[in-house]
């Protein structure tokens, strides 16, 4: 059942500019942290801190992208035009997070990378999330939607698997359950739970619309 809340939507002629503005604003935190890392503003271990912050922002944008559908279904807040941008920004942060790990943290030394993975297996979860995200990012365009048809929706449901491995990667990397991991675990549970009950909610909404209005 949807709540009686509706926000005015932006006229379509302004949407492209709004989407590009979202890309610029969304990538600003990464650029800011890069500047801080390069100028000594991230403290004692700037590489680790930079790597961690990129991962956090990847998780934030991933969650924001997955919130678009519940907001539309339950509150009539239609941000569907921005979902692709939110997903791609999340992908860019995951890619940057992984690149910083490989290049700055491990220095592209294969032995060091392999040893680190054996010592910290949760790194494999992060790598799995990136691998799954690659085809999702590559098919986040109208041509792929037309080409793949119904298979596109099936493919992009894998984003929920990315959410699971991303949250697990984050929680295991923290090595302790504090407020921040609890927040992302809770967000994951809510998003996955809504995905499970959504068919029932949408059926109820369709039945309500089909019901004759009493005069």
From Swiss-Prot:
<keyword id="KW-0812">Transmembrane</keyword>
<keyword id="KW-0472">Membrane</keyword>
<feature type="transmembrane region" description="Helical">
    <location>
        <begin position="50"/>
        <end position="70"/>
    </location>
</feature>
<feature type="transmembrane region" description="Helical">
    <location>
        <begin position="121"/>
        <end position="141"/>
    </location>
</feature>
<dbReference type="GO" id="GO:0046872">
    <property type="term" value="F:metal ion binding"/>
</dbReference>
<keyword id="KW-0285">Flavoprotein</keyword>
<keyword id="KW-0408">Iron</keyword>
<dbReference type="Pfam" id="PF01794">
    <property type="entry name" value="Ferric_reduct"/>
</dbReference>
<keyword id="KW-0288">FMN</keyword>
<dbReference type="GO" id="GO:0010181">
    <property type="term" value="F:FMN binding"/>
</dbReference>
<keyword id="KW-1133">Transmembrane helix</keyword>
<comment type="function">
    <text>Part of the MsrPQ system that repairs oxidized periplasmic proteins containing methionine sulfoxide residues (Met-O), using respiratory chain electrons. Thus protects these proteins from oxidative-stress damage caused by reactive species of oxygen and chlorine generated by the host defense mechanisms. MsrPQ is essential for the maintenance of envelope integrity under bleach stress, rescuing a wide series of structurally unrelated periplasmic proteins from methionine oxidation.</text>
</comment>
<comment type="similarity">
    <text>Belongs to the MsrQ family.</text>
</comment>
<dbReference type="InterPro" id="IPR013130">
    <property type="entry name" value="Fe3_Rdtase_TM_dom"/>
</dbReference>
<dbReference type="GO" id="GO:0030091">
    <property type="term" value="P:protein repair"/>
</dbReference>
<keyword id="KW-0349">Heme</keyword>
<dbReference type="GO" id="GO:0009055">
    <property type="term" value="F:electron transfer activity"/>
</dbReference>
<protein>
    <recommendedName>
        <fullName>Protein-methionine-sulfoxide reductase heme-binding subunit MsrQ</fullName>
    </recommendedName>
</protein>
<keyword id="KW-0813">Transport</keyword>
<dbReference type="InterPro" id="IPR022837">
    <property type="entry name" value="MsrQ-like"/>
</dbReference>
<dbReference type="GO" id="GO:0016679">
    <property type="term" value="F:oxidoreductase activity, acting on diphenols and related substances as donors"/>
</dbReference>
<keyword id="KW-0997">Cell inner membrane</keyword>
<feature type="transmembrane region" description="Helical">
    <location>
        <begin position="17"/>
        <end position="37"/>
    </location>
</feature>
<keyword id="KW-0249">Electron transport</keyword>
<dbReference type="GO" id="GO:0020037">
    <property type="term" value="F:heme binding"/>
</dbReference>
<keyword id="KW-1003">Cell membrane</keyword>
<keyword id="KW-0479">Metal-binding</keyword>
<dbReference type="GO" id="GO:0005886">
    <property type="term" value="C:plasma membrane"/>
</dbReference>
<feature type="transmembrane region" description="Helical">
    <location>
        <begin position="152"/>
        <end position="172"/>
    </location>
</feature>
<feature type="transmembrane region" description="Helical">
    <location>
        <begin position="177"/>
        <end position="197"/>
    </location>
</feature>
<comment type="subunit">
    <text>Heterodimer of a catalytic subunit (MsrP) and a heme-binding subunit (MsrQ).</text>
</comment>
<feature type="transmembrane region" description="Helical">
    <location>
        <begin position="85"/>
        <end position="105"/>
    </location>
</feature>
């Amino acid at each position: 059942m949807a709540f009686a809340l509706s926000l005015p939507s932006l006229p379509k002629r302004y949407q492209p500019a709004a989407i590009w503005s979202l890309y610029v604003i969304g990538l600003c935190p990464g650029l800011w942290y890069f500047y801080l890392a390069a100028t000594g503003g991230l403290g004692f271990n700037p590489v680790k801190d930079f790597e961690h912050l990129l991962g956090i922002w990847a998780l934030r944008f991933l969650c924001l992208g997955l919130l678009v559908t519940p907001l539309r279904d339950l509150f009539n807040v239609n941000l569907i035009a921005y979902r692709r941008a939110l997903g791609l920004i999340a992908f860019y942060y995951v890619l940057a997070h992984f690149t910083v790990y490989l290049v700055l943290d491990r220095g592209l030394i294969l032995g060091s990378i392999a040893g680190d993975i054996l010592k910290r297996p949760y790194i494999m979860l992060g790598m799995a999330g990136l691998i799954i995200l690659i085809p999702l990012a590559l098919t986040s365009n109208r041509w792929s939607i037309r080409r793949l048809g119904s298979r596109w929706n099936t493919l992009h449901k894998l984003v929920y698997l990315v959410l699971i491995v991303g949250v697990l990667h984050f929680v295991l990397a923290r090595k302790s359950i504090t407020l921040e991991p609890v927040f992302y675990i809770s967000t994951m549970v809510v998003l996955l739970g809504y995905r499970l009950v959504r068919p029932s909610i949408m059926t109820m909404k369709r039945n309500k619309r089909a019901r004759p209005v009493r005069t």
